[in-house]
Design a protein with these regions (language model features):
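Feature 3881 marks metal-assisted phosphotransfer/nuclease machinery
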Residues: 1-28, 33-47, 62-66, 103-166
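Short secondary-structure transition/capping segments
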Residues: 60-64, 87-91
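Short, hinge-like loop/turn segments at secondary-structure boundaries
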Residues: 66-68, 92-96
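Conserved BB-loop
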Residues: 47-59
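Amphipathic, hydrophobic secondary-structure cores in small proteins
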Residues: 55-56, 63-66, 70, 83
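Acidic, metal-binding active-site segment of PIN/NYN-like and related structure-specific nucleases
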Residues: 69-87
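Short secondary-structure boundary segments
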Residues: 31, 78-80, 101
């Protein structure tokens, strides 16, 4: 099936979501995303830590994932290894946002745009991210994988995002 436009949420929908998800999202920014991304998030009012802030610089992905789970922080990274459910199981997933880098290998502008889209979807609510892996492709299309299945979205410059229907 083709892309179709999502329905605009009603005010009641927004209020209900706000009541369900009261905790503010906190981020853990991976080394490959860079300290600049952590600073941008902090400057936007988010609780964001860079791996070095937690003594995790140079540590393996499993250590980073465990620390994020313990502190309930959403991992922000360019590293698609975090999408592997065998290494990083969904039931112990604090939330992962993977932004595939552009052709230059590092695209923090794209990362920040994609994070803004993720927060637009979730509000500022930490609970929404738990158990989800958000995978932004280099064209900023989004695939969300969770125990509830897999959903694909495509943002446009104006209007609601499109959702892919199988």
């Amino acid at each position: 099936m083709p892309w179709r436009e999502l329905d605009e949420p009603t005010d009641d929908d927004k209020r209900e979501l706000d009541l369900q998800y009261r905790g503010k999202v906190q981020f853990l920014v991976d080394e490959n995303a860079g300290i600049e991304v952590a600073k941008i998030l902090q400057g936007s009012g988010y609780n964001a830590k860079f791996v070095a802030d937690l003594g995790l610089r140079g540590r393996c992905d499993e250590d980073l994932f465990a620390a994020a789970w313990k502190d309930r922080r959403v991992i922000v990274t360019h590293d698609a290894d975090f999408l592997d459910n065998n290494r990083f199981p969904p039931h112990r997933n604090p939330g992962v946002v993977v932004v595939r880098p552009g052709s230059d290998g590092r695209d923090n502008g794209g990362l920040v745009r994609c994070l803004a889209k993720a927060v637009l979807l979730a509000g500022k609510n930490a609970t929404w991210f738990q158990g989800k892996k958000l995978d932004f492709s280099s064209d900023e299309a989004l695939t969300i994988t969770s125990q509830g299945g897999r959903h694909r979205y495509l943002w446009r410059k104006h209007g609601m995002p499109l959702i892919w229907e199988d």
